[in-house]
Amino acid sequence: MATGPRYRVPFRRRREGRTNYHVRYRLILSRKPRVVVRKGNANITIQLIIAELKGDRTLLTVSSKELRNYGFQHSTGNVPAAYLTGLLFGKKMLALGYNEGILDIGLHSNSRGSRVYAALKGVVDAGVDVPHSPEVFPDDSRIRGEVIRDYTGVDVVSQFEAAREKILG
């Protein structure tokens, strides 16, 4: 792969398509803790990460799997679960003494109304100061699960409200 004296091999994580170092550099320059949102098909994970010279240090991790403890028994990969995970993360983040952060979505697409921004809305609603634009948040009917109820007939809204009250209460 590295042939010729003028060729420079990119960093391994850049070659694998896992890290955008230009964005990472800008996030670290802010000197704020990063609120890292990662989504899969079945789960949402949010982490509080601080950059140090030895390497990044993870202070807090919240997964949407934890919502089962708060009475949310539906899918943990949808928009209501992302919001509740963000809300739970925000409460735990404030309990640790961190009241601000900066959003790190990694290589996820920057789509208005996505699960990433539903999680961010949960973090912001918990009282954490994260720079954002309100236009990127999904509308309240999607966050509460009314769209899922209309589509599948499963009542997500009541469990969403109960879990939200349990997290905030």
UniProtKB/Swiss-Prot annotation:
Keyword set includes Signal: no
GO biological process: ribosomal large subunit assembly; translation
Name of one Pfam family that matches: Ribosomal_L5e
A GO cellular component entry from the record: cytosolic large ribosomal subunit
Gene3D superfamilies xrefs: 3.30.420.100
One function term, GO molecular function aspect: structural constituent of ribosome
Keywords per UniProt: Ribonucleoprotein, Ribosomal protein, RNA-binding, rRNA-binding
Keyword rRNA-binding set for record: yes
Family membership: Belongs to the universal ribosomal protein uL18 family.
Subunit structure: Part of the 50S ribosomal subunit. Contacts the 5S and 23S rRNAs.
Function of the molecule: This is one of the proteins that bind and probably mediate the attachment of the 5S RNA into the large ribosomal subunit, where it forms part of the central protuberance.
Listed name of the protein: Large ribosomal subunit protein uL18
